[in-house]
């Protein structure tokens, strides 16, 4: 086994949020990074993206200028009655930052991406700036040689290759993972609403709540509206779910022609009139294709690993997709830093898989449950005493804020490293959680 830290030449396939995050993490760890983006620009499509404390902490640790992303700092989660709009379940986040050390941010996806890209590529900050090459679509990888072959005829050899190329990952298939995916039982249309326009029309100003707001989700049906404020509250991002038989968009990709607003309103004859009036002025109405992926058997092979949606695509109902990609990036940055990396890429990737696969798989499963039961969603899952319609599949297995935010990735990495190296781990932690930590559902870590 190689001994001692060495600087690696790293290739990152995919220039989205996950790709830029891992470029920053590896840059901070002292490595040379090239990001390859298949399109002629590195950007993002979509609208709002949620970044809870378990994601935000890494942005701060990496020195990202979070204010560039123009975030909304969330103060509560509100679940409203489908017909009346009255709150059914509310979870306060007033002491969230004080308790967990970092804010719960909502970003516009494009702003968040620009914020990360600037940090990865700029001259300021620790580590060599990452390089970005566009129009480089991955065609194949020679796993023995560590060489990436691109569709434009270029080849590039790297010590480490990170597949951050999203839900339709090419790298995933090259590693031999061919998922059996199936359409979700719900469809989703997304729309943006200008707060200024809503206020001028005399509609409710939801931006004042600084909240993630939900209509429905309590009765086991697929009907649900999710409101995410972003751009400092200037933009309201609506995700509108309904049974797939009322509209199947599995063959339509985001970025095609906008759907008519009448199509957005049609599934909801009994929806709360106040939020329905917001949807009526919605623009950029786009379908979001939803697919259910079973957990993948592994995340790495040879000198290649998967990150984010390439490695563990999940339903959006825990608002943890971006955070899981950021955590993946953080894990790679830690494992390959000067404290832990001893020069052996294979060992490091084995540790990465041991750290990330169980946690991401757990969130993946919890997101699927929250699709039809809002009480399974982090936050609401601890609201048993404050919600008359509270019901979950198994209270002992619910995902909680404590499990997400009390997690110490450094301790998890150390534990998995000792396992791989045949050493003893003595710190009072289990998979990054402190022994003795009591969850709201009564579960005690290590008991």
Question: Which residues make up each language-model segment?
Answer:
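Active-site-adjacent segment of FAD-dependent monooxygenases/related oxidoreductases
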Residues: 46-119
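Conserved mid-domain beta->alpha element of the FAD-binding
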Residues: 12-32, 36-39, 162-163, 189, ...
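Conserved FAD-binding catalytic core of PHBH/FMO-like flavoproteins
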Residues: 86, 103, 114-283, 296
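Accessory recognition modules or surfaces
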Residues: 2-11, 38, 42-54
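Residue-level detector of high-confidence beta-strand sites
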Residues: 38, 90-92, 135
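Acidic/histidine metal-binding catalytic segments
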Residues: 70-73, 131, 266-284, 342-350, ...
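Residues at the starts of beta-strands that form the adenosine-phosphate
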Residues: 9, 32, 235
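C-terminal helical "tail/cap" subdomain of flavin- and related membrane-associated enzymes
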Residues: 2-7, 84-87, 318, 334-447
């Amino acid at each position: 086994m190689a001994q001692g830290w060495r600087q690696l030449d790293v290739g990152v396939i995919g220039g989205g949020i996950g790709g830029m995050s891992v470029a920053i993490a590896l840059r901070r760890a002292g490595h040379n990074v090239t990001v390859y983006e298949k399109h002629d620009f590195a950007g993002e499509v979509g609208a709002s993206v949620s970044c809870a404390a378990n994601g935000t902490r890494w942005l701060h640790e990496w020195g990202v200028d979070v204010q560039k992303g123009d975030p909304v700092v969330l103060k509560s989660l509100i679940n409203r009655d489908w017909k009346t709009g009255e709150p059914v379940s509310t979870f306060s986040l007033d002491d969230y930052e004080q308790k967990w050390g970092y804010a719960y941010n909502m970003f516009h996806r494009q702003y968040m991406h620009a914020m990360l890209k600037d940090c990865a590529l700029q001259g300021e900050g620790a580590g060599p700036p990452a390089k970005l090459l566009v129009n480089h679509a991955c065609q194949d990888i020679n796993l023995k040689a560590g060489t990436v072959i691109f569709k434009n005829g270029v080849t590039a050899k790297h010590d480490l290759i990170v597949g951050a190329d999203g839900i339709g990952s090419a790298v995933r298939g090259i590693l031999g993972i061919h998922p059996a995916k199936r359409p979700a039982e719900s469809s989703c249309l997304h729309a943006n609403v200008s707060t200024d326009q809503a206020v001028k029309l005399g509609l409710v100003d939801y931006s004042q709540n600084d909240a993630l707001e939900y209509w429905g989700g309590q009765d086991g049906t697929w009907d649900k509206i999710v409101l995410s404020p972003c751009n400092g509250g200037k933009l309201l991002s609506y995700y509108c779910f309904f049974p797939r038989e009322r509209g199947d968009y599995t063959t339509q990709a985001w970025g095609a022609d906008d759907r008519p607003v009448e199509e957005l309103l049609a599934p909801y004859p009994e929806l709360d009139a106040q939020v329905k009036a917001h949807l009526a002025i919605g623009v950029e109405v786009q379908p979001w294709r939803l697919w259910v992926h079973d957990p993948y058997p592994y995340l790495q092979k040879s000198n290649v690993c998967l990150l984010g949606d390439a490695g563990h695509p999940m339903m959006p109902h825990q608002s943890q997709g971006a955070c899981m990609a950021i955590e993946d990036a953080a894990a790679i940055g830690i494992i390959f830093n000067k404290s832990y990396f001893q020069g052996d890429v294979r060992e490091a990737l084995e540790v990465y898989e041991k750290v990330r696969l169980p946690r991401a798989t757990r969130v993946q499963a919890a997101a699927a449950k929250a699709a039809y039961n809002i009480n399974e969603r982090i936050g609401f899952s601890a609201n048993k005493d404050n919600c008359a319609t509270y019901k979950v599949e198994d209270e002992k297995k619910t995902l909680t804020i404590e499990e997400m935010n009390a997690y110490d990735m450094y301790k998890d990495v150390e534990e998995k490293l000792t396992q791989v190296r045949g050493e003893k781990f003595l710190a009072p932690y289990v998979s990054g959680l402190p022994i003795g930590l009591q969850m709201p559902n009564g579960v005690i870590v290590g008991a």
